[in-house]
Amino acid sequence: MKYNQSNIKKAKKYLDSNSCIGIPTETVYGLAGNAYSDIAVKKIFSLKKRPKSNPLIVHYSNLSKLKDDCHVNNNFLNLYKTFCPGPITFVLKLKRSSKISKIVTNSKKTLAIRFPKHSVTNKLLKILDYPLAAPSANISSKLSSVKAVDVKEEFGNKI
């Protein structure tokens, strides 16, 4: 799929219907789904053949959306200002009011989060009403996908 506004809107429709898609990041491709949806999150675990005990990472577009789900402190904010967006993962305490699927975290009280730097993924995240659960787009224990063709080869028409 080419990266244009029409296809970003198409990706949003897939995600809104609890489907999973491949998304580019500045490191590897991610297998993405609505982090608030148990249905989408279950699909990610199933497609990846990932153990449910291995929590997923969640991608956010900005701090205000993150603050809906996680507690932030000055230490985090200083690191955020220095390193984000980019290839760094933070682990933050979830708020009780968070809508993040408990399946994402294996019912733990913390969440691994990122702010990806890839322009296409950021455009998509900005038009969504939810963050994306998006671990690497590969079967668990296999090499991570670094190109769109790798994702298509790995998952075919399942996403």
Feature annotation, model-predicted:
Residues 1-159:
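Active-site-adjacent structural elements in enzyme catalytic cores
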